[in-house]
Amino acid sequence: MAMEQFESVFTAKENAEIAKEFTRLKDTCYLDHAGTTLYADSQIRAVGDCLTGSLFCNPHTSRTTEDLLDQVRFRVLRHFGTHPSEYGLVFTSGTTGALKLVAECFDFGDEGAFVYTRDNHTSVLGMRAVVGTERIVPIGREDLRGGRSTGGGKSSLVVFPAQCNFNGFKYPLGLVEDIQRNGLVGFDGDRFHVCLDAASFVSTNALDLAKHQPSFVCLSFYKIFGFPTGLGALLVHRSAQNLLKKRYYGGGTVKIAMAGRNFHVKRDSLADQFEDGTVPFTSIISLLQGFETLERLVPASGELSSIDRVSRHTFALGRYCFQRLRGLRHANSNSVVKLYHDTEFEDRGSQGGIVNFNVLHEDGSFVGFAEVAYMASVHNVVLRTGCFCNPGACQRLLELTDEDVLKQFNAGHVCGDANDLIGGQPTGSVRVSFGYMSRREDVDRLVEMVEKCYVKKMTANGLTRKQIVSNYKNYDQPKLKMICLFPIKSCGAYKITTSWPLCHKGLKHDREFVIVDENGVAMTQKKLVEMCLIKPKIDIKTNTLILTHPAMENFTLSMEPLSNESQSIKLCQTKVCQDNVQAIDCGDAVANWISIALQTSGLRLLKQSDDEARTLRKSTTEIALSNQAQFLLINQASVRWLADLVPDWDDLSQEPTLESLVDRFRGNLIIDSVKPLEESSWTQLRIGPLEFSVDGPCSRCQMICIDQSSGTRTAEPLRTIAREFKGKMRFGIYLSHVKSLEGSDEKLLHCGSPLQVVAE
């Protein structure tokens, strides 16, 4: 196949039928199938029809349900080319649950060894904490090869993935027979059993257990079908099932258990012994619809099974993506991406449909993965960043020593955070992956996003904060120009040019309300961009909240406090920035108005309970429903500076005004000064008689790419911020009110008041 070409494995008709199943994606480009693939619309409808059309009792009650579960077991085993005489199947909560079960139950006897490859999933590393042996040995991939054992020896266990979830490298499955027959190099006195982590592999590949027969296989079904979640399996070869010594027993797993005497007898079958309590039987039954849907949308063709065709399709997309990204060049001919792979995508037998990379600036320095994730979100591209719960592969491919990893941890980086660059070196990477519903257009969207955001570079070099400040010699005292209030979290601003009172949480009535969906989840413009069109106003005299929207009549809501004991109110729970918040439902009338305005059913408006208090992390300062702090300060001079650096507002017909750009940053206190970015050095300041401490810089996200007057999404100014500050997307500073000047009881902020820097 020629470079950068893609030939579809599926027919035009098959592609069309598949596309009909995923219309809910709309304009979203989904590229995280290694995280979870997507369920088809007809699959979920079929599950619903099955559950509503039949009566499924507890399998401990109904023989019919129990028999159906056995049929599902047969179907799963058939998918993997085996049958109950060869393998027993234990349903678990997922791959992690299956691995934990093996770790807890495997009988190592007298000093057997637990061996694992370093590029295993974290769930395998966690096995070290519970295995019944002290001989725990990590090995490199290159050391995973058969030895010269003659049989017998200590019962030992080796765990490796069929496919690395970091970059899609496939381990040769012939190693299974070699190791189980001949042992491992360097472990002459051990008889090894293989535990295969198949979660990543089976999502898009055929695992033939008639050909390769590891003692244990662990997998999750949502990786294959997208639904149900929370369900996996442990497949145990019949020759190895006596090696699992289970101690705990739950309901349904014993023939007899006596309450007064410590006596019990386990059931005979593997599943009956290991499936404690009632299994998730409705989820298990829904696997039948998963198999049916997959085989209907991707039918077998000739000697190729459904999953074989999926494997060919995802590999072809992965190779096309790999080649396109590798071909990107900056104007100076430097590469735009650094790829983290162990193959060149030559062979489907050694490589799956996963591509892993980091983006590079034209000078060769790294772009942080958090920045790439933000920009992808702006372009409606869903991808995964970080280390993907595979610290070993991450460390090896990013060429980090143990000391480097510990240094990053001591610098504040933890798994799952956005601390993407430390000392200029990446702490993780970007991963894209493909499923049977992925298309060539998805790869093109990804590459277009990378080109648009990182290849089109300005010729001017970015300046450091210190250089910028030193270029401005004239100094005028900054002034408070405007106060912006956001009564409803993530809706439009109520702009004040006179004065406004403070309370113990910040500006009075700031982010006092929140819109939630029918599940009680707080809504933001990231999910529902049209929220910016709701512009609340506050009438202090009547103590009312007035909601405005360009397509709606105004709605007036009383803000008079209600007692939590009142029979007319409904207390609710929602979550804001990982904090559980108690709030009061504002009623059906305003809920209906908001649902119509935002064209989304089931929305509710909640008001933070008057006696509810959130506090800043590592502080006792109280805040309302704001994300991070009491106040966010934005300097108009900094916004002007930033606007001048934006090379092209190619998403808009004309450049935005300064006011509209300031609005994007959603600050509470808008100041103006001569020096752009001077606020970044402040630690204490005073506005009029009120003193504030600086809590730190504001980390920006894709919210600033939303035009607050129209809801239009753009790539700027986030792209320019990321470039100028070397991937650290910070703009504006957080403040907390400390005190008023001695002799002053005033708690009012006045627009026009001078701003005095107390400490830097």
UniProtKB/Swiss-Prot annotation:
One GO term (biological process): molybdopterin cofactor metabolic process
Domain of life: Eukaryota
Residue span, MOSC domain: 608-758
Cofactor names: pyridoxal 5'-phosphate
Enzyme Commission number(s): 2.8.1.9
Top-rank EC class of the record's enzyme: transferase
Modified residues (N6-(pyridoxal phosphate)lysine): 223
Described function: Sulfurates the molybdenum cofactor. Sulfation of molybdenum is essential for xanthine dehydrogenase (XDH) and aldehyde oxidase (ADO) enzymes in which molybdenum cofactor is liganded by 1 oxygen and 1 sulfur atom in active form.
Organism lineage string: Eukaryota, Metazoa, Ecdysozoa, Arthropoda, Hexapoda
Active site, renumbered: 389
Protein name as annotated: Molybdenum cofactor sulfurase 2
Family membership: Belongs to the class-V pyridoxal-phosphate-dependent aminotransferase family. MOCOS subfamily.
Catalyzed reactions per annotation: Mo-molybdopterin + L-cysteine + AH2 = thio-Mo-molybdopterin + L-alanine + A + H2O
Organism from which the protein derives: Culex quinquefasciatus (Southern house mosquito)
MF (Gene Ontology): lyase activity; molybdenum cofactor sulfurtransferase activity; molybdenum ion binding; pyridoxal phosphate binding
Gene from which this protein is expressed: mal2
Keywords: Molybdenum cofactor biosynthesis, Pyridoxal phosphate, Transferase
